[in-house]
């Protein structure tokens, strides 16, 4: 029976969803007897501070928002910004005869539905309405087939929320006292931060190895074509039967893993190349194997985040935001899922499109099934796919921008999942010969031809490694047979150096967390966002770089809260929480063991001590945070660099120091905030210490009482005010300190307080023209200028900023605007130096709206970006995305020659010992010196939020 005919008998139904966008879409599918309203997310939560806790609660309950002495009873309060919405829902409920709770079908959605029921206290029938796609048929089916609330899911979500509150509110204050105020710890965020820090430690300990090899271009002697090339390129594989070392044959200290491998240095490689000049080569073997590649499974949350990062340059958060919009507007199924399963309807829709778009030859006789799911999956139960029983092609959707790109990605992946395998042949050709000195050499070439593209016709998965070959890439070799003679047209001597392990990107960090079974797919985007916001990591291009602050935090947690950041322990916690969700374990006993350490197996054992699967491996958090006297704050935040220099993380950021504070030979210098820990060498530290102190206190602003200091910053010397401790640094109430660059005629050692106050008073209002449009004098990266509306004019000197009169300004505007460089508009915002191009990045106003540019690459701001809010990191990310999409640069083909040599990169010095926060390699000295001249505008403390707790 349809919803419309049901309500025709009388009655009014209230349907509550999370978001207004979702409400708007669903409303169009239901009849006039339905009222669809949004809760606008969670309406109730644990209190964010003691001020929100009802007065009847005192002591620990007031601090934590959880009564740990009475079965961990949570104290819920209606969010201040949701009170008016709750009143609206209650008013609508009074006029309704039935309530449908239509929140998302996952654990979080079930909790929202339960909180709505608890707060609204309906006296009418209540039904739980679930669906995983917003289509007319799906919504009507959900109305016709409601269910009861799943209390197990509700309990599981509540347990997670309480656990995260206890973890955050008990451990975070330790960080405030021992490292820096306003930091945070979290069940998953701290482990994710540790992963990034450990990868940087590996890079710090890494020693590069130089190795050489030979590459030969061999000709068959016959004319070739596209299907049968006339030559092939092969790499030297063995010399006298010993395999020639490649990068994978060296360990992280630059040593060969096996003595049986031949390590060629430059001299030996060149000598061998010379000995091969007149060698006669022949094909020794041709091995052909069938090639088959099956389609990739449809997307789940994490694979969508990873692929959107690789192919579209989206961060995890951006991917989920775009996917949320697509879901709410009825284009895709629910985007938080661990499943790769497709419904029968979806399989039929995908197979129909395969036949329609690619033909019956691309359709397998039987539907493909993808039953594999992540362990303990508790999210929605179908893969992410286009919605409906007939998939709209991307062109049919009318979508634009990021929504179009992500929909197209999902659509292609889904359709491809129901196509035939790609098939072909892979071939390996071995080419041998004898050098003039008698040594036997063997070169090897591999090829691949695809005879039937199958699913590759529709979709090819990206790769995290930029050097990895994609599945649809063919390498055709000449048709040769064993014994065929070949001529060496060119023997190239190639030098290489092993590289440190790559830093995590958002995509690879998500993959790592999932493989370790830490956290849940629905939380990964927010976790990465949190560690970026807290200043624990920052981005260089797409790489996630740990800050020195994160080294201090992880150092403390590892030494004093080892269990809490142990990977296996965290995964077992996740497993226990899922057992609670399935009803196989009880919440309160588990929380009691976690917090108080009750139960067997908790007598101080390490995180690796496995329990019986019922939480017995948990220790007592309360006891861990009670005795803090043993934690030496200075020790956990100090890291040796070398030459008696230490890197320390202070309340206002990292610095290097030699000697004790009160000693006569004491030296101290700030470390640039954007310096990667693996770039801090002894040489760079010495250079920093040799420079004058970075901060010059000029005095106090009489108007505000704030201290005014001069600094040598990343973009040159500047003055700024020091805001009082406790001033909000993030969020809508954030306060930014006044800052201004020094004039070219000024220097750090001569600038005065009066100079600083004048500089920080800019821009100066000069006056208004006859039409009342304000004219201001401003100082920018490209010099002083006047601004009137969107019309800007350059000034000749910096002094004019304070001296120019209204009459003089009007006279300048009365002149025709100059063309060429002088006519260029000043930037809307200056972001800093791009880590890739090393050029200044600015925001400009273009014909099609604001865009970021470094002078070489332009990238338009997206719909959810604004000139006022865009950060330097976001600007660099947009440019990196644009570069990734651009055409690859073509290099001119070199003339054929007999012997050529490519110089290996300079080998790192391996003599100097490196420690957790220092790296002394000659190869990095130059880069480190360059970086030393820069410092970011934001410190780690500025990035930290005032929130005590964190989700996960």
From Swiss-Prot:
Mg(2+) binds at residues 18, 104. The gene is topA. It comes from Streptomyces coelicolor (strain ATCC BAA-471 / A3(2) / M145). Its cofactor is Mg(2+). This is DNA topoisomerase 1. Residues 184-189 are annotated as: Interaction with DNA. Its EC number is 5.6.2.1. The active site is at 334 (o-(5'-phospho-dna)-tyrosine intermediate). It catalyses: ATP-independent breakage of single-stranded DNA, followed by passage and rejoining.
């Amino acid at each position: 029976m349809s919803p419309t005919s049901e309500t025709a008998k009388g009655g009014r139904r209230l349907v509550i969803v999370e978001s207004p966008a979702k409400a708007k879409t669903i409303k169009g599918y239901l009849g006039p007897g339905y009222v669809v309203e949004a809760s606008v997310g969670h309406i109730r939560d644990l209190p964010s501070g003691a001020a929100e806790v009802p007065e009847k609660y005192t002591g620990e309950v007031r601090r934590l928002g959880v009564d740990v002495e009475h079965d961990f009873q949570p104290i819920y309060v209606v969010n201040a910004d949701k009170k008016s919405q709750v009143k609206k829902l209650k008013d609508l409920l009074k006029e309704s005869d039935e309530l449908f709770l239509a929140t998302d079908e996952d654990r979080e959605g079930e909790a929202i539905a339960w909180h709505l029921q608890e707060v609204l206290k309906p006296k009418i029938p209540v039904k739980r309405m679930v669906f995983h796609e917003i289509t007319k048929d799906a919504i009507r089916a959900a109305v016709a087939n409601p269910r009861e609330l799943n209390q197990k899911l509700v309990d599981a979500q509540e347990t997670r929320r309480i656990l995260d509150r206890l973890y955050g509110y008990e451990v975070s204050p330790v960080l405030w006292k021992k490292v820096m105020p306003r930091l945070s710890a979290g069940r998953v965020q701290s482990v994710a931060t540790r992963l990034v820090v450990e990868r940087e430690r590996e890079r710090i300990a890494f020693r590069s190895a130089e190795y050489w090899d030979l590459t030969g271009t061999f000709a068959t002697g016959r004319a070739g074509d596209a299907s049968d090339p006339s030559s092939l390129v092969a790499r030297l594989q063995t010399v006298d039967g010993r395999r020639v070392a490649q990068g994978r044959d060296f360990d992280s200290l630059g040593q060969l893993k096996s003595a049986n491998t031949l390590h060629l240095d430059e001299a030996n490689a060149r000598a061998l190349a010379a000995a091969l000049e007149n060698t006669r080569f022949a094909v020794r073997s041709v091995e052909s194997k069938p090639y088959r590649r099956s389609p990739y499974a449809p997307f789940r949350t994490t694979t969508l985040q990873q692929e959107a990062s690789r192919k579209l340059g989206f961060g995890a958060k951006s991917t989920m935001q775009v996917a949320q919009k697509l879901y709410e507007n009825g284009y895709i199924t629910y985007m938080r899922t661990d499943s790769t399963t497709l419904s029968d309807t979806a399989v039929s829709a995908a197979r129909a499109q395969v036949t329609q778009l690619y033909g019956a030859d691309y359709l397998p006789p039987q539907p493909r099934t993808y039953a594999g799911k992540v362990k303990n999956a508790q999210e929605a139960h179908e893969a992410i796919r286009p919605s409906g029983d007939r998939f709209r092609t991307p062109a049919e959707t009318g979508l634009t921008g990021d929504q179009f790109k992500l929909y197209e990605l999902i659509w292609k992946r889904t359709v491809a999942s129901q196509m035939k395998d790609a098939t072909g042949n892979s071939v390996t050709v071995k080419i041998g010969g004898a050098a003039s000195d008698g040594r036997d050499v063997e070169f090897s070439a591999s090829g691949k031809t695809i005879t039937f593209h199958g699913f590759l016709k529709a979709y090819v998965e990206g790769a995290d490694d930029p050097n990895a070959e994609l599945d649809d890439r063919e390498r055709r070799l000449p048709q040769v047979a064993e014994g065929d003679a070949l001529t060496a047209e060119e023997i190239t001597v190639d030098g290489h150096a092993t590289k440190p392990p790559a830093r995590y990107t958002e995509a690879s960090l998500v993959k790592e967390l999932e493989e370790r079974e830490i956290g849940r797919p629905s939380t990964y985007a927010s976790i990465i966002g949190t560690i970026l916001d807290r200043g624990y990591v920052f981005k260089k291009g797409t790489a996630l770089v740990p800050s020195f602050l994160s080294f201090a935090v992880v150092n403390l947690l590892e030494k004093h809260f080892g269990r809490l950041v142990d990977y296996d322990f965290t995964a077992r916690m996740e497993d226990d929480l899922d057992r609670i969700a399935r009803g196989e374990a009880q919440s309160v006993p588990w929380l009691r063991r976690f917090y108080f350490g009750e139960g067997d197996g908790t007598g101080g054992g390490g995180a690796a001590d496995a329990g019986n699967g019922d939480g017995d491996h948990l220790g007592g958090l309360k006891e861990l945070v009670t005795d803090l006297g043993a934690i030496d704050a200075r020790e956990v935040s100090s890291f040796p660099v070398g030459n008696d220099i230490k890197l320390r993380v202070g309340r206002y950021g990292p610095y290097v120091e030699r000697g004790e504070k009160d000693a006569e030979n004491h030296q101290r210098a700030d470390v640039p905030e954007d310096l990667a820990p693996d770039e801090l060498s002894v040489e760079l530290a010495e250079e920093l210490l040799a420079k004058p102190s970075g901060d010059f206190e000029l005095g106090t602003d009489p108007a505000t009482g704030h201290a005014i200091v001069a600094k040598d910053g990343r973009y040159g010397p500047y003055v700024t005010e020091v805001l009082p401790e406790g001033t909000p640094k993030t969020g809508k109430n954030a306060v930014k300190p006044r800052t201004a660059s020094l004039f070219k005629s000024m220097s750090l050692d001569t600038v005065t307080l009066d100079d600083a106050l004048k500089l920080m008073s800019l821009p100066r209002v000069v006056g208004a023209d006859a039409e009342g449009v304000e004219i201001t004098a401003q100082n920018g990266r490209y010099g002083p200028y006047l601004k009137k509306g969107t019309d800007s004019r350059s000034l000749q000197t910096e002094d004019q900023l304070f001296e120019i009169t209204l009459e003089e300004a009007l006279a300048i505007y009365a002149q025709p605007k100059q063309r060429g460089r002088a006519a260029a508009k000043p930037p809307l915002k200056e972001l800093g130096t791009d880590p890739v191009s090393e050029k200044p990045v600015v925001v400009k106003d273009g014909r099609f709206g604001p865009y970021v540019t470094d002078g070489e690459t332009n990238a338009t701001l997206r719909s959810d970006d604004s000139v006022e809010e865009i950060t330097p990191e976001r600007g660099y990310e947009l440019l990196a995305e644009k570069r990734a999409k651009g055409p690859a640069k073509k290099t001119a083909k070199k003339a054929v020659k007999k012997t050529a040599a490519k110089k290996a990169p300079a080998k790192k010095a391996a003599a100097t010992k490196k420690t957790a926060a220092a790296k002394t390699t000659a190869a990095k000295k130059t880069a480190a010196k360059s970086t030393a001249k820069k410092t970011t505008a934001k410190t780690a403390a500025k990035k930290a939020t005032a929130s005590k707790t964190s989700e996960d």
